[in-house]
Curated annotation (Swiss-Prot):
Matching InterPro entries: FMuLV_rcpt-bd (IPR008981), TLV/ENV_coat_polyprotein (IPR018154)
Protein name: Envelope glycoprotein
Cell cycle as UniProt keyword: no
GO biological process, alphabetically ordered: fusion of virus membrane with host plasma membrane; symbiont entry into host cell; virion attachment to host cell
Lipidated sites in chain (S-palmitoyl cysteine): C603
Amino acid sequence: MESPTHPKPSKDKTFPWNLVFLVGILFQIDMGMANPSPHQVYNVTWVITNVQTNSRANATSMLGTLTDAYPTLYVDLCDLVGDTWEPIAPDPRSWARYSSSTHGCKTTDRKKQQQTYPFYVCPGHAPSMGPKGTYCGGAQDGFCAAWGCETTGEAWWKPTSSWDYITVKRGSNQDNSCKGKCNPLVLQFTQKGRQASWDRPKMWGLRLYRSGYDPIALFSVSRQVMTITPPQAMGPNLVLPDQKPPSRQSQTKSKVTTQRPQITSSTPRSVASATMGPKRIGTGDRLINLVQGTYLALNATDPNKTKDCWLCLVSRPPYYEGIAVLGNYSNQTNPPPSCLSTPQHKLTISEVSGQGLCIGTVPKTHQALCKKTQKGHKGTHYLAAPNGTYWACNTGLTPCISMAVLNWTSDFCVLIELWPRVTYHQPEYIYTHFDKAVRFRREPISLTVALMLGGLTVGGIAAGVGTGTKALLETAQFRQLQIAMHTDIQALEESISALEKSLTSLSEVVLQNRRGLDILFLQEGGLCAALKEECCFYADHTGLVRDNMAKLRERLKQRQQLFDSQQGWFEGWFNKSPWFTTLISSIMGPLLILLLILLLGPCILNRLVQFVKDRISVVQALILTQQYQQIQQYDSDRP
């Protein structure tokens, strides 16, 4: 490629490449965000079109994923041909090729005549793949310029191939009089066709096998993919107005529900109002509902744990965690309603614990999550998870999985319960944060509610529905928590969609504006040359945010140093780590005992040795007195 002439130095030409690189990054981000879940169900329509007349010969629609939505297509040969085989009298060449007595579908006799001729089909999406490098021609030859280019059809030599996308055969005819459609064709997709990309139409050529010139008909097969409920954007961006604090009504409701709920008719109405309320709630209300629903579920299962506790919603990822469970899923041939509500984007669950039901080929790294493993089912089946559960696959979170996708991608899924990441704390843990001298007696214990309520859907409440008032109560409280989680996930999906559209619109506007300005100032050498700018770039203001964060960290560091300077040397030890406090309290007793032994041990030992020696001397004296007798002494002076 030749470089365009430019009057400015070479450094002025660097910005367009930087812009292309920047926009390329934007498109990569957009493509990553727009990558849907492979289990997403769409309304897929297959259209067969006569290329020569641009008329639609057949259109078949079905619900399914992009992997298994390959139905059998039925089309009539006369609809596929149209008027292209009708005789053209003024042209002698055409008259010789298309005899008015044998071709076309205008009369009943001609329709019956088409049933007697074999036909063969040649692909136009790969015209060079003939036998031994034979060129198969173009559209004027029906892509069948040489024998061996045909890949399917209904002829005596039975044309086949291992790489073409479709097979075309004759169907059964029910109309012997040929007053209607009497030349049915059956089009089926091959395994290669199911693996191919159908982003654009693909063309084939169909020719009748007869003596002389074989008539040609060109047709194309295309796929149209539409979502079940197409999104409609109206008004401003919904992401920014959604960031609002909790409403007072939600706070008042939370105070009322802190007591033990009773079995009344108001409980179902509160659940129904939460699902059918037309008012759009904000981020603050959604977070409050998650904590409130968690409390109600925990209070319904174990009221003793909710007498004095703290429930904290974790503000850092992961926001949800999964508990693997065992359950009975529903196996259906048509997509159930739960499959139609599959998220548009892939949601990843980074933390899954426990053991449950696994479907597919599970690698060794994840076999610890499987208590029961099933290989799945062959064919087109949809496995819907039980109410309140999801399938956690390595391609994302989904309430319904397609076995065609699972078998084709070698994917695996685990049946899980989805819980918000809410930690359970004893009251002492919170009180220490309000104490000026923070001292932890031991390492604080924090449990997630998922570990405390795991298996509630399948093994606990769901199994006890209808057995009494407690089961009904716990089911209602758990359902309210599920509604809160569903609302939060739905809001997350809407936010991602809105951000995706904003990014796409921004990249399109940047490209259009820059391309238009460069074309407008083409004679001057481009926009930068016309503005006489040596450097054209986008001013990124994230540096200001980075500087402000650095200043904030510096102020926090100064406050920490001031706080440490006001403390004594002994108090500073216990504020460094709770592990240090636990270690000191554990070894202080043995250390004091050892110190006392070292100080008082020698004195006590000396006294003990002296006492033993004295007793030994006494014993020796007693032994000597027993073996000898005392000699009596007489005084000579005494009479």
